Amino acid sequence: MSGTGANGHDGSDRAIEIERPGPGDHRTTILVDGRPVETLVDLPPLRNRLLFVGLNPSPVSVAAGHYHQDRLGRTFWGRLMVARILPADTPLEAADDALVAVGHGITDLLKTPTGRDDASDAALTAGVGTLWQKVAIWRPAAIVFVYKRAARIAAGRALEESWGALPGVALAGRPCFLMPGPYAPREQVDEGLNFLRNIASALPD
């Protein structure tokens, strides 16, 4: 699947995805400062399902055509299986397809791929407005940030919470939650994933 955005420093002004793509290669092309850049297309959730938000795609993930295919990313998918968001037998190489199949969605603050932690705060902050627009259009039940840095930038302030509900943080009227960090202690991970499991089980049918 491919598309082209208008000129912009990060391609964030391209049209927001409405249709939910089927399984397969999720690569797309945007324009960044007038040059084509390969990235991953947004995978919108169904209304009143969960929207997971990361920082930006890794080059490994873009090359694979699927979200979160580096080491930390695959840990994220494993955690969603533990939380029963995804079936326990979900293949990691196409876990984003399984996420879409159960009604949830995924996007990033910044669509330009970089190495881990290479994206600047300024570049990530530039994507917050577009994220608001996506949430307003898609209307998920809640936003779940994969990483605390993404949550902090979207909130526009420091966050005390290590995981769970983010009081006072909402996007387009939707509540926001944070997953435990990739290197969080096991007890914290277990508590956080149980919390996420409870959120998912409370979603309307």
Put a short name on every predicted segment:
Residues 2-47, 70-72, 116-132, 157-205:
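C-terminal capping/extension of enzyme domains
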Residues 101-154:
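Internal catalytic-core helix/loop-beta-alpha segment
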Residues 61-64, 153-156, 188:
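Short glycine-/acidic-enriched loop or helix-start segments at secondary-structure transitions
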Residues 52-55:
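N-terminal nucleotide-binding beta1-loop-alpha1 segment
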Residues 38-45, 89-100, 134:
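Short amphipathic alpha-helices and their capping/turn segments at secondary-structure boundaries
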Residues 60-123:
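Short, surface-exposed acidic-centric catalytic microdomains
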Residues 49-50, 142:
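Structural motif
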